[in-house]
């Protein structure tokens, strides 16, 4: 998820992921008051993760050192992502089909598909498969899967089927010819309208309905097309400013995920606007801007790889105090949970940078 020296940065992907971050704040802030099915933050976030992952797989193909890299960091995200589950839902540390667990498993699937297909476009063309599996499997299966490893494949929450489809669609839309984006948008829009008309109700996000799938694919396509449009105007000061406004959170998305919980918990203002829609718009922008400022400071700190061992020590020490029941103040755990989560995000990025740099040096020496 985080950038590394090898992965490079595709600006339009960072911009689109930044848009997903903005939608994430809106989704968690508004809850069910205005949009019962949330926003399309997760599909867009997942699609951008699929793009970045496939690009890095292509760039590091042939370097055996990166084979371990591509296995280790999804596993680290899978288990370390339990800190996000605690922050979002409370309770103790546990491994469930959560947001980061879905990302980790999907990255491993992309790694496998990247080994099977030399060209990434056929990988992207598989995006309907997870959705079809989800729609064809009986809902009753989820009850028997609950509490077992199979729940990560199918069930409540961010199960691999159907959410893997958005990672694959990200690869698809990345390789789709730019000049043919309008016919694709028209086809998705027509299909989404038809699905909404047939459904006759609110699209279901979890136990995903066909209407939600098509609307989400349309939203991802529109966001990425807009991101490309913004990038295309990078010679103008306004376009560059807008690009950086979204790209900064996009290239620091893991830290943003944890940071936005902190702001939602402690920085939300009272509703003093005459209409809730105004409150939603301005509060979302205010929280996003607050995240942006903090991420600007963080982006400088993450370049300091000398912080790796102090961050490891602090994460382990704080985690031991929290989960060992050794904290004295009763109100401390929520704040400490946030601190441990943000430290994990920082540690994850530092480790990736360190590991990628070492792999690159090994490749240069071998060459």
Question: What positions do the PLM features span?
Answer:
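Alpha-helical transmembrane segments and their immediate juxtamembrane cytosolic regions
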Residues: 1-367
